């Protein structure tokens, strides 16, 4: 058989064209240092900031420092199996967490992995932990109230859907209790809640989860926990993982309440990472970009425009102060980023005023826009009355000769303080808050002994539930007060038949 050279040439060319290489090209580096949740690797010249990197044992890290001769990597999870000389490769991806309805009711770590022993989470949707915040034109003014169920907040420092309201105070002043009560009050409000525990004891997180489960709040809540025993990178990433889960709901037109408990511990974890990565320290040894650490997180909370679905993320970040010093570095940073702050004072807490909210230092920059009309009408002057009472109370310690008007202000002030007290885990619906504040501001409590105020309040609610439920219904549906004469008559009828005369 004759062999044709042209045929052989064509056959070889075809085989070359059809050749499929069966190997992957990946950029790899070698670990030169490992310790304290930090690795350094040489050879990853094209790595991007924030890129996910995979170690040879299956662990993941995130590129943080891109230097001329190596890359500084924070390790996400356990680093005990990583050794110097191990291979680390680029993935070309940034860190993502699982999101979606399947996450609700679960307790997860900052990587989105379940830690509640209830099995795997059935979801395929993911979102990057770092995404840009909505722009100016993508936002909408905050106008819908977020009812916390706490009279002292809903009346004095109202919070709206899409607002960022800082909760600041010393340790053991009831910060977490305020947030848990706000979550409990969202039952039936078509609200999804996310509780991010940063650097808390695992026993404390367990207690909070059991509280949420006991009151049925876990049915609409996701808990993200990075406990004190976990490496610093997980504490640093936890709030971003939480807000990524929240954004999935917000961009689908839903409303989310997210609690960061607390950002002081995140800042400390970030300081630790930055110093280990040899970044230059600044004030209080924090790195220069610690403001950006919190601003890029909190700016992702917003009320988005109708074109984007009209959803919202409301953020309640916590900051722990030392001896009530709200002028500290991290505290002033977060105060300047947020739309107001609720300041909890240790001396008020210890004197039995709980929630221990200092009305003078607390403010909401959204204000009346986030209140229903009925609450605006009954709570309009409450803050000023309380401030003048505190001033008079301090003044009267120097003398006892008081005119009748001053005495009346002091009496009203004492009753105001009592009315604003509230038992733990007993949030009140807004219509009940409106009725008791109306009774207070219209003088119905002036002749009730201060020690009987809480009993009066409970009895008033029971009486209205039994005889005047239509008034509660009017406030609920119209968001406004019923006829004043009708409300006056109902409260007077209760006083006439009770022992509080």
Swiss-Prot record:
Its EC number is 7.1.2.2. SUPFAM superfamilies: C-terminal domain of alpha and beta subunits of F1 ATP synthase, N-terminal domain of alpha and beta subunits of F1 ATP synthase, P-loop containing nucleoside triphosphate hydrolases. InterPro entries: ATP_synth_asu-like_sf, ATP_synth_asu_C, ATP_synth_asu_C_sf, ATP_synth_F1_a_nt-bd_dom, ATP_synth_F1_asu, ATPase_F1/V1/A1_a/bsu_N, ATPase_F1/V1/A1_a/bsu_N_sf, ATPase_F1/V1/A1_a/bsu_nucl-bd. The record marks 362 as: Required for activity. CDD domains: ATP-synt_F1_alpha_C, ATP-synt_F1_alpha_N, F1-ATPase_alpha_CD. It comes from the Bacteria. Disulfide bonds: none annotated. GO terms for molecular function: ADP binding; ATP binding; proton-transporting ATP synthase activity, rotational mechanism. It is found in: Cell membrane. ATP binds at residues 169-176. F-type ATPases have 2 components, CF(1) - the catalytic core - and CF(0) - the membrane proton channel. CF(1) has five subunits: alpha(3), beta(3), gamma(1), delta(1), epsilon(1). CF(0) has three main subunits: a(1), b(2) and c(9-12). The alpha and beta chains form an alternating ring which encloses part of the gamma chain. CF(1) is attached to CF(0) by a central stalk formed by the gamma and epsilon chains, while a peripheral stalk is formed by the delta and b chains. Produces ATP from ADP in the presence of a proton gradient across the membrane. The alpha chain is a regulatory subunit. This is ATP synthase subunit alpha. It comes from Streptococcus agalactiae serotype V (strain ATCC BAA-611 / 2603 V/R).
């Amino acid at each position: 058989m004759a062999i044709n050279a042209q045929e052989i040439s064509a056959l070889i060319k075809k085989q070359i064209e059809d050749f499929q290489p069966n190997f992957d090209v990946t950029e790899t580096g070698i670990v030169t240092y490992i310790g304290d949740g930090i690795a350094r690797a040489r050879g990853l010249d094209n790595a991007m900031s924030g890129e996910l990197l995979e170690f040879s044992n299956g662990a993941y890290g995130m590129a943080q420092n891109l230097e001329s001769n190596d890359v500084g990597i924070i390790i996400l999870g356990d680093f005990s199996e990583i050794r110097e000389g191990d291979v680390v490769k680029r993935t070309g991806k940034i860190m993502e967490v699982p999101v979606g309805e399947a996450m609700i009711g679960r307790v997860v770590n900052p990587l989105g992995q379940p830690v509640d022993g209830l099995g795997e989470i059935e979801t395929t949707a993911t979102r990057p932990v770092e995404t840009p915040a909505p722009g100016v034109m993508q936002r909408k003014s905050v106008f819908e109230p977020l009812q916390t169920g706490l009279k002292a907040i809903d009346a004095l420092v109202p919070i709206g859907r899409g607002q960022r309201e800082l909760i600041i105070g010393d340790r053991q002043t009831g910060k977490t209790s305020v947030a848990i009560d706000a979550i409990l009050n969202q039952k039936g409000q078509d609200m999804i809640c996310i509780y991010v525990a940063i650097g808390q004891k695992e026993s404390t997180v367990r207690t909070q989860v059991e509280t949420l489960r006991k009151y049925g709040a876990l049915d609409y809540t996701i808990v993200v926990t990075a406990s004190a025993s976990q490496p610093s990178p997980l504490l640093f990433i936890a709030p971003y993982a939480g807000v990524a889960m929240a954004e999935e709901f917000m961009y689908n037109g839903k409303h989310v309440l997210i609690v960061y408990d607390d950002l002081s511990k995140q800042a400390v974890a970030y300081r630790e990472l930055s110093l280990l990565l040899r970044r230059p320290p600044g004030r209080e040894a924090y790195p220069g970009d610690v403001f950006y650490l919190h601003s890029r997180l909190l700016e992702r909370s917003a009320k988005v425009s109708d074109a984007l679905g009209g959803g919202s993320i409301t953020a309640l970040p916590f900051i722990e102060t030392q001896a009530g010093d709200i002028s500290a570095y991290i505290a002033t940073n977060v105060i300047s980023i947020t739309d107001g702050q609720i300041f909890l004072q240790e001396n008020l807490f210890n004197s039995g005023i709980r929630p221990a909210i200092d009305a003078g230092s607390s403010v909401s920059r959204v204000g009346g826009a986030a209140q229903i009309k009925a609450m605006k009408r009954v709570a309009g002057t409450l803050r000023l009355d309380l401030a003048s009472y505190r001033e008079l109370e301090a003044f009267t310690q120097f003398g006892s000769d008081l005119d009748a008007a001053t005495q009346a202000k002091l009496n009203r002030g004492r009753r105001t303080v009592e009315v604003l007290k509230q038992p733990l885990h007993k949030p009140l619906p807004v219509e009940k808050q409106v009725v008791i504040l109306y009774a207070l501001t219209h003088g119905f409590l002036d002749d009730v002994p201060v020690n009987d105020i809480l009993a009066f309040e409970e009895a008033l609610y029971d009486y209205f539930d039994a005889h005047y439920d239509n008034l509660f219904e009017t406030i609920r549906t119209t968001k406004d007060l019923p006829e004043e004469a009708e409300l006056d008559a109902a409260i007077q009828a209760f006083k006439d038949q009770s022992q509080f005369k």
